[in-house]
Regions:
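Conserved active-site alpha-helix within GNAT-family acetyltransferase domains
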Residues: 113-140
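Short amphipathic alpha-helix that is part of the acyltransferase structural core
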Residues: 2-48, 55-63, 158-164
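Conserved GNAT acetyl-CoA-binding A-motif
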Residues: 103-116
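Conserved acetyl-CoA-binding loop-helix of GNAT-fold acetyltransferases
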Residues: 84, 89-103
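Short acidic/glycine-enriched loop/turn segments that link adjacent beta-strands
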Residues: 50, 75, 136-140
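Conserved beta-strand in the GNAT
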Residues: 57, 63-71, 76-83
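Short, charged/polar, Gly/Pro-enriched secondary-structure boundary elements
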Residues: 149-154
Length: 164
């Protein structure tokens, strides 16, 4: 009997990304956001290589199975490009990445633009809608914000978090 393969968490700045990992990350983003969601848009937005950007992903046997990007937007951290490979969905990787991202962010406010059907997922991690639904590349999104831990808005959420 062989042990179950383990997903390895990796983190890097753009400068620290090797070309193989960068290619696998960009391929996953294109496979899901462009091909699967049928959304032709410019994924390469010039933010991946900013000095404050952090890349987090799970890999198994050389395959990037889930990914998230954290941008430093001055007074807030911006979470984006949250993506899970079709073959890895249901394994809880997106939730584990969110927990890791929030650990890295620490006691700073964070924002994201959630695809509308994922609002409840992000709410599990303390995010709350901050504006009306809008279309981005034809997909409904809702702006969300998470206040630093310990504030009145988030202090009761830690106990309610559950894995994805």
């Amino acid at each position: 009997m062989h042990p179950e393969p383990i997903d390895e968490l990796r983190t890097a700045t753009f400068r620290d990304l090797d070309t193989t990992s960068l290619y696998a990350i960009l391929k996953l983003r294109a496979d899901v956001f462009v091909v699967e969601q049928q959304c032709a848009y410019g994924d390469l937005d010039g933010r991946d290589d900013e000095p404050g950007t952090r890349h987090l992903w799970f890999t198994r046997d050389g395959e990037v199975r889930a990914y998230v990007r954290i941008l430093n937007d001055g007074d807030v951290e911006r979470i984006g490009r949250v993506v899970t490979a079709k073959t890895a969905r249901g394994a809880g990787l997106a939730g584990r990445l969110m927990e890791e991202a929030l650990t890295i962010i620490g006691n700073r406010p964070s924002v994201l633009d959630a695809q509308a059907y994922l609002v409840d997922f992000y709410a599990r991690y303390g995010f709350r809608p901050t504006g009306p639904e809008f279309l981005e590349d034809g997909i409904p999104h809702i702006p969300m914000r998470r206040e630093p831990q310990g504030s009145a808005a988030t202090s009761s959420l830690t106990e309610r978090r559950r894995p994805v």
